[in-house]
Amino acid sequence: MSSEYYTTIGMDVSDRTTKVCVMSKEGRAPRVVMETTIPTTKEGLAKFLSTQDAATPVAFETGTHCRWMNEVAQGMGFKVYVANPCRLRMVTDSKAKNDKNDARMIARLALADPGLLHPVRLRGAEYQRMINLHEMRGLLVKQRSGIIVQLRAVAKSMGFRIAKVSAAGFHNLDRAAWPKELRDIAWPMLKNLEQLAVTIKTYDKLIRELAGTPAFKAQVDRLMEIHCVGILVATAFVAVTGGDMDRFERPRDVGPWSGLAPKQDQSGDVDRQCHVTKAGSPLLRRLLVESAQLIMRDCSSDTDLKAKGLRICARGGKIARRKAVTAVARSLAVLMTAMLKKPDAPYVPLSERCEKELLAMRAMV
């Protein structure tokens, strides 16, 4: 399918400057009309676009600056294509790769057929805010875990063991519970952990408040009907998908989209077994796996998802448990998508067939 445009603007965005290529095919083969460099700022972009016809589409790749650039260009009446760089091999794998050539190639692809850019849909501001809150919270949780692991390692190296306690309550350990040799080392870090705990709770509060807004509330409440799906998983799923389930023709399409489906490498009689692609959002994938691990626990409620995981574990093998968790995480994403696609359909956590299957597996133990 050819493009309906006769002129396009391609941009290769760097942190400080942006290479711009205006390309036209009117009356002849594609040719470069103008090339320039502009500052990567709102003012610089607006100043350049003010000299161009608003009927000319603008194309650039996803990246740190793509959101505000999209807002500025659309606010001035331009059609914007935000290209997916993971699908642009002729740009990323070019033998003569530089900013100038990248801008030219993006403009040429938009001129030939905008579909070749594999344009992505950017999330709304409220969804991006939720993702930002999750990422900041995740960073703090990772810091807290690292400090706790290091303190336990130091204690072991000195012949001591720290009492088992949750990460959230680790800083509440009484000073007297620490050996004398460790108190001076551990106490400053415990103060740091206490401050981290306060900050994490602040982010939890902000996430809950945003989850109560109209953009999130209905879908988050629906997803939290699922066993072992809390507010963090539900809000992350809605935010990363942008609340738009129409992007998935079938619920199972969310598996490859979230990076939880195995890569396919089949040719003739050869069908290689590959790892999951890990495409998409690492944040969502991590939270789905954490929920899957909770579902697989012995103390968790019996559900169809748990039955599926135990069925895979029963096959045996060195990594059966890991395969089961990944499969449950993928099935959980499919279930969440299906429930949002049909918000009025009743949720049945455990079917009669899976209930009998679980009873049979336990009888064999």
Model-assigned labels for residue ranges:
Residues 1-365:
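A detector of single, family-specific signature residues
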